Swiss-Prot record:
Subunit structure: Homopentamer.
Species: Methylobacterium radiotolerans (strain ATCC 27329 / DSM 1819 / JCM 2831 / NBRC 15690 / NCIMB 10815 / 0-1)
Transmembrane regions listed in the UniProt entry: 14-34, 38-58, 82-102
Subcellular location: Cell inner membrane
Record-given protein name: Large-conductance mechanosensitive channel
Membrane topology: Multi-pass membrane protein
Gene from which the chain derives: mscL
Function noted in UniProt: Channel that opens in response to stretch forces in the membrane lipid bilayer. May participate in the regulation of osmotic pressure changes within the cell.
Gene3D superfamilies linked to this entry: Large-conductance mechanosensitive channel, MscL, domain 1 (1.10.1200.120)
Length: 139
């Protein structure tokens, strides 16, 4: 049974998946940092620090107006559309940052594939000899 588990765990697909999950988690942290530390402050500055997360519609007369969303939920039923707007905006920004990163990676890969392979020195020398011999008349 241990040998069978060893075969399963060390198969290429399982190892590739594990590497992908680990890299994905690390990449997710980078993207989240870009969103929270770079893009959201800019959006906050543009909107004057507007916080959508406290926008809600009270469904109960028990809910006092002007309360933060968390406190309003404790008093009664509310539709918290502000939190939905915040998460939707966050998703759009994450998707855009991911698009920019993947676009940059694709451009780097494209630039890398466009580089012509350098001809090895021995092949270059043989080509020169061939060209010289081709210009000489045959006897």
């Amino acid at each position: 049974m241990l040998e069978e588990f060893k075969k399963f765990a060390l198969r290429g697909n399982v190892v590739d998946l594990a590497v992908g999950v680990i890299i994905g988690a690390a990449f997710g942290a980078i993207v989240n940092s870009a969103v929270q530390d770079i893009f959201m402050p800019v959006i906050g500055a543009i909107t004057g620090g507007l916080d959508f997360s406290n926008y809600y519609i009270p469904l109960s007369s028990k809910v006092q107006s002007g309360l933060p969303y968390v406190d309003a939920k404790k008093q009664g039923a509310v539709i918290g559309y502000g939190q939905f707007l915040t998460l939707t905006l966050n998703f759009a920004i994450v998707a855009f940052v991911l698009f920019l990163v993947i676009r940059a990676m694709n451009r780097l890969q494209l630039a890398e594939t466009k580089k012509p392979d350098e001809v090895p020195a021995d092949v270059k020398l043989l080509s020169e000899i061939r060209d010289i011999l081709a210009t000489k008349p045959r006897v």
